[in-house]
Amino acid sequence: MSEARRTVLIVDDEAPLRRVLERALEREGYRVLGAGSAETAYELLAAGPADAVLLDIRLPTMSGLALFLAIVNRWPALAGRIAIMTGDADADEVRTWIARNPCALLRKPFNLRQIFDWLTTVLEAPGRERGNG
């Protein structure tokens, strides 16, 4: 990985899953921010840069899909650096949304290798600047 630690924001209201992802990414050398709600995620992004976002679709007060659009609208550099996590990837609503808003889709249950591979692809590509910084 590059010399500067890359920051990954994990947005999932399932605290046990969020903690597993946080620990795994920290072991790989990433700086990790965790949010259990859309509001917290937006506040964290407003407070400082993130290089990639792992975003659950089902959040308590706002859908992850709506948060995705809000993030890309405010921080266009994060477009292409947000992966949607869901167990409902085959639902019509999700398929239609993904067709209109291309982004990475990580189907739950996923394995950590899928997360690491996606992060390597979006963060280590030559010429990639920091996300919303």
Q: Would you name each region that the model predicts?
A:
Residues 34-52:
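Acidic, metal-coordinating helix/loop segments flanking the phosphotransfer/catalytic sites
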Residues 19-27:
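Charged docking surfaces used in two-component/phosphorelay signaling
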Residues 18, 60, 90:
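The feature encodes the CheY-like receiver
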Residues 37, 63-67:
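Acidic catalytic/metal-coordinating carboxylates
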Residues 56:
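Active-site residues of response regulator receiver
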Residues 34, 59-62:
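Residue-level signal for the "D+5" position in two-component response regulator receiver
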Residues 1-9, 15, 73-78, 111-133:
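Non-catalytic signal-transmission and effector/linker regions of two-component phosphorelay proteins
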Residues 85-86:
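Hydrophobic/aromatic residues positioned on beta-strands within the core alpha/beta folds
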